[in-house]
Amino acid sequence: MVEANHILQRSGENFKKFIFSFTDQNGRELCLRPDLTIASCLRYLKLNIKGKEKIFYNGEAYRKSQNRADSIIRSQIGFEIIGSKNEKKDDKVIIDTALKSLQNLSYTSGTLKIGNVQIFNLLIEKLDIPKRWKLRLVRHFWREDYFNDLLKRLETNSDVDPTIVEVDKKRYKNMLKDDKKKIIAGRSIEEILNRFNKKIKDPRRTNEGKKISQIIRKFLKISCPIDQAAIQLNSFFKKNDINIFVEQNYFSISKNRIMKLDVEFSASFGRQLEYYTGMVFKIDIKNKLQKKNILNGGRYDKLISNLGGKKETPAVGAAFNL
């Protein structure tokens, strides 16, 4: 049992419909744990552990599913590395551990899909859009439908409220009469007027918003064998004059096929849980009867601090769904 806000805080409000929650006699909203990663982080905090810890666990998680045939009780086996600063090495250790664990399973084929939320965040940071838009796009990356609505608004420049513009114009005219060196809320009137001129009198052109939106949409469509990931990403960034370069060894895996798994990169993959901050991956396997998602994992460097830790703590892990 955990407090529901621990889950919703970093998994997103949309995730709420999948958890089993109730309110106790003190008004606290509690829920059955929907996964064991957050439970492991809460334990790390409770024990006041300093530095690196490797965790192995097995237990049950409780989550509703869109498929009524799925069980609400999910048995999981997981492994985490918390508090280590060797990010690339740890990412590889987690993926390698996951692959080794497949050796005793019977399956005919499968897919190891890899994404990286950090690359998306870097892209947004480099785009020539107002800071408020950067914050919105990063914050709502996990809410796919709402994120697409934001891209449509970006295309039409519809975030400018005409009512607010009229009020600002009145303030603008009054400020023109004031001393330009006068300070208001930490900025000089001259700075405020310059910003107003840039934002309102010469707003971002609609075609600029369309261009930015198209760049984001095209980026999210990048999907390829893992050995082509750096090549395709760098080609995309160069074509769109974006100052980002991905090294060939950036990804923990470079082979397109490992065991019976095709290894793929997807720029849009990683939108399931809001607490992911870097590398994310999943393994789906097939046998004669069905295709099944057997494992999910990724890096979550901000989860410890968001759950009450005093600082960000590097962490990465994965869990099997049995």
Regions found by a protein language model. Give the residues of each.
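Hydrophobic alpha-helical transmembrane segments in multi-pass integral membrane proteins
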Residues: E29-R33
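Acidic surface patches and DE-rich sequence motifs
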Residues: D24
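Short terminal or interdomain "cap/linker" segment that borders an active site or interface and mediates
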Residues: N116-V117, N121-E166
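Glycine-rich loop at the start of a catalytic domain that most often binds anionic cofactors/ligands
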Residues: H6-S21
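Short, glycine/charge-rich beta-strand/loop segments that flank catalytic centers
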Residues: M1-N5, K54-K64, T111-L122, H140
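Positively charged, Gly/Ser-enriched RNA/tRNA-binding surfaces
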Residues: V2-A4, D35-I49, I55-Y107, D159-L322
